[in-house]
């Protein structure tokens, strides 16, 4: 009886490993906004025009003046 229970437990752990359980928010995929680069935080961003100078704009994601 105990060996059958051990085999069943082993099979269950192989089919459903503990690593697939979600952790407590320490994964980067759970917090995409915190790790995204903002155009306002970029040194090339012009606060009055609300965009970047044209030659530099291609490197800034989601820049309002370049699309």
From Swiss-Prot:
Residues 1-22 form the signal peptide. One of its GO terms (cellular component) is extracellular region. Keywords: Amidation, Cleavage on pair of basic residues, Disulfide bond, Secreted, Signal, Toxin. One of its GO terms (molecular function) is ion channel inhibitor activity. It is found in: Secreted. It comes from the Eukaryota. The modification Cysteine amide is found at residue 66. Residues 23-50 form a propeptide. Its main location: secreted. Expressed by the venom duct. InterPro entries: Conotoxin (IPR004214). Disulfide bonds join 51-65, 52-63, 57-66. The cysteine framework is III (CC-C-C-CC). Classified in the M-1 branch, since 1 residue stands between the fourth and the fifth cysteine residues. Belongs to the conotoxin M superfamily. This is Conotoxin reg3.8. It comes from Conus regius (Crown cone). The lineage of its organism: Eukaryota, Metazoa, Spiralia, Lophotrochozoa, Mollusca.
């Amino acid at each position: 009886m105990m060996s059958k229970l051990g085999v069943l437990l082993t099979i269950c752990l192989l089919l459903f490993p503990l690593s697939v359980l979600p952790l407590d928010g320490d994964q980067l995929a759970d917090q995409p906004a915190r790790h995204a680069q903002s155009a306002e935080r970029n040194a090339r961003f012009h606060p009055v025009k609300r965009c970047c100078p044209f030659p530099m704009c291609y490197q800034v994601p989601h820049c309002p003046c370049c699309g």
